[in-house]
Amino acid sequence: MSVKLTEKKTVSAMNTEQTFLIVVDGAIRRLSLGDLQKIMGNNIFYPTITLEQSSNPKFALPTPFMADMYQRAMGGYMMKVVNGKAYAAKLAPSNWEFFADGTKVDNAAKYETMVHVPDCHFKADNKTLQFGGLFPISGGKIFESPNWVGAYKISYDGNSVAHSRPNVTPKHSQTMSQFFAAAQKLGSNFGLANYGFQCLIEALYQVSFGNLNSQSVIGSGFQSSSWEACRDVPMGKCISLGDGSGKVLYNDATLGNQYPVKLFGFEDLWGKLWEFRPGIRFYMDGDTRYAVVYSGNQVSNTANGRKFTIPSSAGGEYITRKTLGAYWDAFPQAVGGGDSTYYCDGFWASTSGELLRVGGSAFAGSRCGLSSANSYDGFSLSRTVFGARLAFYGNPTIVSGSELMAM
């Protein structure tokens, strides 16, 4: 039976093991994308961006092909721990009320809603990033992010166990160490979304949208002087966006119109309440302030790692420059911009600050955003506006939705 290839649907992304049809010596043969990549060389596939060339938050963006492929390999999952072992089932990309196998999710409160974050390859120098995504780049690196990160901010159950679930309010008024301890109650491979994840998600956003103003591109997030009311709105308002990015309208009598946001499946990365990001710590040595980037599933104020100098003071001014460099460090280095220039987000720092939080609360308004960062506070501080995001540092067994529900 003949097949008309021109009548078949087109696709906008491929995995490395998937194949093209080609003609070799008059015969039809298959060639995998991975092998084609090796034949053609890296540069034809990997987009390159350069930041901070002007105050305009928009910058030249090559084809988002690699970013699209990486996003398609992400996606929402329901995860469940059974007898100490983690299992995960893919959610339908466009509707998280269903599993990918078509089974309707029975009860989201039985699971952790997580987003798969595959290893992400890149090569960077100074202010220029070459994005490999799923594909290694010769001489490049991998962002040190956990491969599974909560779609929602952490909430607690009655036993003070951390979860990533919709339809509940996020937990606050905990130290970073307390959030970590609550996550570990799920299992030793659970922890918090870290600084490596922050660097990855900012890079992916950059190569996907070509505009550093996340509030303008995606949405404002919650913004109100009634920030406690914003904080306490139950999570899951963006569930209709599935694996995607964008905003939805939320309205109540106290807050009026608000626009919770979702980026690559992650809800409210900015504008609801701050999120701790372990994996980086700060200290003073004389008059110089340093950042130390440390590895692993841990929360520490003493861990060793690579270090670089950082600003010792900032009071919420808008970021103009970040560390970037070979590790594409997302930590700010200078301020002086505005809410529509450079990174468009605010930065706070002090000589006594020891830990990082990101995103911003509803009260911070236009200073919130994906790039917003605060290194002002001590390691043991907790406040009603501080939250965290769950992460899983292991490898769950992938099952179907119906199989997960039966466990």
Where are these regions (language model features)?
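C-terminal, surface-exposed recognition/capping segments
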Residues: C199, S220, S225-M235, G244, ...
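Acidic glycine-/aspartate-rich tracts in secreted/extracellular proteins
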Residues: V24-A27, C120-F122, K153-Y156, I280-R281, ...
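Short, intrinsically disordered N-terminal pre-domain segments
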Residues: M1-E17, M405-M407
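Short, surface-exposed terminal/edge motifs of secreted or surface/virion proteins that either
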Residues: I22-G41
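GGW-centered surface loops in extracellular recognition modules
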Residues: N42-H116, F122-A124
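A short, polar/charged loop-to-alpha-helix boundary motif
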Residues: Y283-S295
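Short hydrophobic/aromatic-rich beta-strand motifs
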Residues: E17-V24, G265-E267
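Short aromatic-cysteine micro-motif
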Residues: K104-Y111, F131-L269, L273
